Amino acid sequence: MARADKATAVADIAEQFKEATATLITEYRGLTVANLAELRRSLSGAATYSVAKNTLVKRAASEAGIEGLDELFAGPTAIAFVTGEPVDAAKAIKTFAKEHKALVIKGGYMDGRALSVAEVERIADLESREVLLAKLAGAMKGNLAKAAGLFNAPASQVARLAAALQEKKAAEGPAEAPQPATEPPAEAPEAPADAE
């Protein structure tokens, strides 16, 4: 590869690093071209899957300000530059790796830090953003309905009590005017028993 071509390739890869929301790094030793094409299709717009020379990728990562990945760039390395949801891309790669043992997840990079294999797999095990938002909305809707019921309950209870009291008074008939209370006569104080 000519020096100018290498510089262009490094600039292109660096730009992909900068634009990606996450990168997932894999080893593809033993996969066929057909397997790689199948993996690219399974990513379906969530990421672009690229194979490049490790030296060029290291330089591009350095230019993009990404650190901590150099040890992952050994052997036949391919990178998924995630532009959509990291969960979707990680899930697709993990599923493909289960079906094709030749694909090995080496790690990744997201939110300014390197990811271990375990962290990439945990991301893959998460539910997608849409599912999580739907669950949150469902939980909020249920809680709002309960809150509305709680706020309406006291008012309806007071209304039922008022109606019951009104019916009871109507059944008793007209009430007599209250009589003024009479005070009992004051008692005379007792004389002391010692007086003689």
From Swiss-Prot:
Alphabetically list the UniProt keywords.
Ribonucleoprotein, Ribosomal protein, RNA-binding, rRNA-binding
Q: Name one GO biological process term.
A: translation
Q: Does the keyword Acetylation apply?
A: no
**UniProt xrefs under PROSITE patterns:** RIBOSOMAL_L10
- Tell me which stretches of the chain form a coiled coil: none
A GO CC term? large ribosomal subunit
Q: Which CDD domains match?
A: Ribosomal_L10
**What GO molecular function annotations does the UniProt record carry, in alphabetical order?**
large ribosomal subunit rRNA binding; structural constituent of ribosome
| Taxonomic superkingdom | Bacteria
Q: Is Ribosomal protein set as a keyword in this record?
A: yes
Q: Which InterPro entries match?
A: Ribosomal_uL10, Ribosomal_uL10-like_sf, Ribosomal_uL10_bac, Ribosomal_uL10_bac_type, Ribosomal_uL10_CS_bac
Specify where the region named Disordered lies, as residue ranges: 167-196
Q: Which family does it belong to?
A: Belongs to the universal ribosomal protein uL10 family.
Briefly state the protein's biological role: Forms part of the ribosomal stalk, playing a central role in the interaction of the ribosome with GTP-bound translation factors.
Its quaternary structure? Part of the ribosomal stalk of the 50S ribosomal subunit. The N-terminus interacts with L11 and the large rRNA to form the base of the stalk. The C-terminus forms an elongated spine to which L12 dimers bind in a sequential fashion forming a multimeric L10(L12)X complex.
Can you name this protein? Answer: Large ribosomal subunit protein uL10
Q: Organism, per UniProt? A: Mycolicibacterium paratuberculosis (strain ATCC BAA-968 / K-10)
Its gene is rplJ
